[in-house]
């Protein structure tokens, strides 16, 4: 994202202030859920500062966690009826499947796009459409590798149903993976989420499934890389 120009007459910052300003503009902010994972190794680095290997290892760990929990700014498209990717990653499946039973969306298969997130991807989840949250259901389960087809059915998951102003129901499901053992969902029933708004996070490798109403035109392709909140993956009927 480009930095905003400085208005005329604005007092110029000091060289140190200017450097800090540049860093803030270039480095993505950190999701709050990542703070403990960054602060803990930083504390170890401080306590073990006299031992070079401890200090370096702890700082490396803190940097890796900061990269994992990064929360970059995104600009969703301003078009009616589009569905954006709820996560960064690779499209693993473009098919039809029965939505999670806990969402009460029926037993008929609906269009689905599954996105697999590696440990190197941004791991926050964003609302694929703008709408009201009508259901949020967490279901315990297994921790199979998230790229397996069975993961949607047997792994731990958090399912959320959104009702758009146009009357469509879109479901987005956070699925835990082999390393992902903690699903965070900040959205609650009754909340209204703008398209692309961050609502949750899955720690360390995961998958996100999106279910659409019948008649939706799927635009995503298997193997495609997605950018959460920006890549259009479907057009609602």
From Swiss-Prot:
Modification note: Is synthesized initially as an inactive proenzyme. Formation of the active enzyme involves a self-maturation process in which the active site pyruvoyl group is generated from an internal serine residue via an autocatalytic post-translational modification. Two non-identical subunits are generated from the proenzyme in this reaction, and the pyruvate is formed at the N-terminus of the alpha chain, which is derived from the carboxyl end of the proenzyme.
GO molecular function: phosphatidylserine decarboxylase activity
Membrane topology category: Peripheral membrane protein
NCBIfam families: PRK05305.1-3
Homology family: Belongs to the phosphatidylserine decarboxylase family. PSD-A subfamily.
Organism of this sequence: Rhodococcus jostii (strain RHA1)
EC number(s) recorded for this UniProt protein: 4.1.1.65
InterPro entries reported for this sequence: PS_Dcarbxylase, PSD-A
Record: active site: 206 (schiff-base intermediate with substrate)
GO BP term, example: phosphatidylethanolamine biosynthetic process
Cofactors required: pyruvate
Gene transcribed to yield this protein: psd
Name the UniProt record assigns to this protein: Phosphatidylserine decarboxylase proenzyme
Cofactor note: Binds 1 pyruvoyl group covalently per subunit.
Signal peptide extent: none
